[in-house]
Amino acid sequence: MKKAIIASVIALTMGAGVAHAANNANAGTIDLNFSGTVSTTTCALEPEVGGKNGIMGIQLGQTDKNTKGADIEVVFKPTADSATACAAATTDFVMQWDGVGSVFSADGLKASGGAATDSYVLVKATNAKVNNNQQVNADGFQYEFSKDDVISGLKYTMNLMGGAVVGDMTAAAQVKHWYK
């Protein structure tokens, strides 16, 4: 009898667990992306656009079909909290570009959302030691900067390259950075 009661309790518990695990038609989902680095020298950077720091959404403006849009200068500088650590570095600095939800190709960073599906974002460093003035043309593309340029800023020019399809576009990139 004791075994039968225990078996019944286990069966009820398992059944209750299944009921709670069932999908709720009103439930939503949240996708989270996490990234970070572990380093002996921490040098956190933030983008500066139009003289404003910490701009994580870069507005590329409008352009005509099949036309390169205006140059947008983006300068990556140390955050206030890491300026001292960045200045103390003794080696050159690397920035690596990867697409998020899209990929970099010879044409640039392909649109990952919006109606203008054949548009691209063009990205190129303008004060790098290695690959200077070369457009990012593949995931994993790297620029190398002099350690002295980190404090004054790692400079980039970015453009919207319109395709044949009109409309809005979105794209996202992950930029990893470290001292060599």
Regions found by a protein language model. Give the residues of each.
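Gram-negative bacterial Sec-dependent N-terminal signal peptides
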Residues: M1-A22
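Mature extracellular/passenger domains of Gram-negative fimbrial/pilin and adhesin proteins
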Residues: H20-K180
